Amino acid sequence: MPLDEIKNFVVVSDRLGTAGQPSEAQLRDVAAAGFDVVVNLGLLDPRYCLPDEAASAASLGLTYHHIPVDFNAPQADDLRRFFDVMDGARDQRVFVHCAANYRVSSFVALYGEARFGWSPDQGDAHIRRIWEPNETWVRFIADARRRETAGA
């Protein structure tokens, strides 16, 4: 099964892919495609997640990180944890997902601005490939950009 069958799959670079929640079969495809690390920003809600994604990832030889981000209340600490995980996996192929790639596209855009030299316009374009952020996320992104500019 091709990776582009995963909900909202996006190839960001040769080392970074993002998407919504993969199925068990799609997680096997992620491993078969050569990804080393899975980062899940979704909540452990049975409506949107696998029964035990950490165990499934481990059984496939994937390093697994779970950073539960509340879609209605994303926190600066969540973003810092994400940056730390991404920085630690710099030399690996990373697959980042949440339920629909909304949280992920926003976090990856901010990471791209901080680490890849993307402009805010490039970050916004990346996000809008997937969705139009609601007011909560517009505010979160703006606050994160202000903190980054201030060096916090």
Where are these regions (language model features)?
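Cys-dependent protein tyrosine phosphatase-like superfamily
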Residues: 1-95, 106-152
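Short cysteine clusters
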Residues: 98
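Substrate/cofactor-recognition hotspot
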Residues: 101
